Every structure is written in C-alpha cells, then in structure tokens.
C-alpha cells in the first residue's frame, strides 16, 4: 500500500515537498526529525519564477536561507564530527531553537508559491534549490515524452535535456 504525504495533507509532515511512501516498510534516518516514513520517493513541486534574473536570484536566496536553517535544525551532533564542527552546529541549533521547524517549512512553501506558475516564463524546483542552475524555461515541462532509462520506458519532461544540462552541466 502506498501513501502520498505532504505538508498540505498532514500538519506534522516535516518537508517542503511531497513523498510517496510504501506503508509496508520503515525508513530509519539519522536525523533530529522524528517523523515516521516508509521507503519513499520525493515529489518536487515546480514553482514559478520572476523573469528578471536579479529578482530570481533574490528569490532563490530567501529559500536557500530557510533551507540552511531547516538543515541546521535537523542535523544530529555526532562524535564522528570534529569538536569544532559540533560546537558550531550546537550554537546554530541554540540560535534557531525558537524557530519552529513547521514554520520554516510553511514559510518556504509560501515563498516558493509567490510567483504564479501559469503566468511565469521561468520555473524551478524551489523546495531544494540549487540556485540559478535550477532556473529553466517553463516550456521544458509543458509536455512529456517517453524515454528509455536502464531498460525501462518512463515519462520525462519534453525538455529534460535542457533541464538536466542546466542543473548538472554535461551529464
């Protein structure tokens, strides 16, 4: 049995993107987030961006800042890390103690949806932003095509090559 989980469906869900999970499994993650999940795949939303590149970069920066705080809150302090790194993480965790994790996830989602997808010429996955490399023309996602991947056929965005090239370069 599979289940879709997302912040829009469950207030306790701790990520700014959805997942499809297998309810017959249990995923053990080394994190300060205590949310039960089965083995899962991520579902990343594609959100609109402003046409102006400087505004777009500023938009990415807001999301990246929140992502950094979110990651700081969920990372575990461990003896496998140096004392100095653990000390820096601990100070960061103390400084962000009063910021609820859910607030960060909701704020990321709110900011990501600021620009209407339908009215945007450029789009991106803002839930895990890689900055300007993620920015791509909306036409990349307007249709899908079937492609062969490791012996199986899958649907992919019609402009998958442009999208992957923007993110990874010569993939």
Predicted regions and their residues:
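Mobile amphipathic helical/loop "lid" adjacent to a hydrophobic cofactor/ligand pocket
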Residues: 66-68
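Conserved catalytic core of two-metal-ion nucleotidyltransferases
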Residues: 2-51, 56-60, 71-81, 85-169
């Amino acid at each position: 049995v599979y289940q879709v989980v997302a912040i829009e469906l469950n207030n306790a869900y701790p990520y700014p993107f959805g997942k499809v999970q297998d309810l017959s499994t249990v995923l053990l993650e080394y994190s300060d987030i205590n949310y039960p999940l089965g083995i899962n795949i991520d579902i990343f939303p594609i959100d609109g961006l402003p046409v102006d590149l400087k505004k777009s970069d500023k938009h990415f920066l807001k999301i990246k800042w929140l992502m950094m705080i979110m990651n700081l809150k969920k990372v575990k302090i461990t003896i496998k890390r140096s004392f100095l790194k653990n000390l820096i993480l601990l100070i960061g965790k103390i400084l962000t103690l009063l910021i609820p994790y859910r607030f960060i996830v909701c704020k990321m989602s709110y900011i990501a949806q600021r620009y209407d997808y339908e009215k945007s010429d450029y789009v991106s996955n803002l839930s895990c932003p890689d900055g300007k490399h993620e920015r791509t023309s909306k036409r990349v996602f307007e249709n899908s095509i079937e492609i062969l991947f490791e012996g199986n056929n899958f649907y992919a965005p019609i402009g998958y090559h442009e999208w992957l090239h923007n993110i990874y370069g010569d993939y």
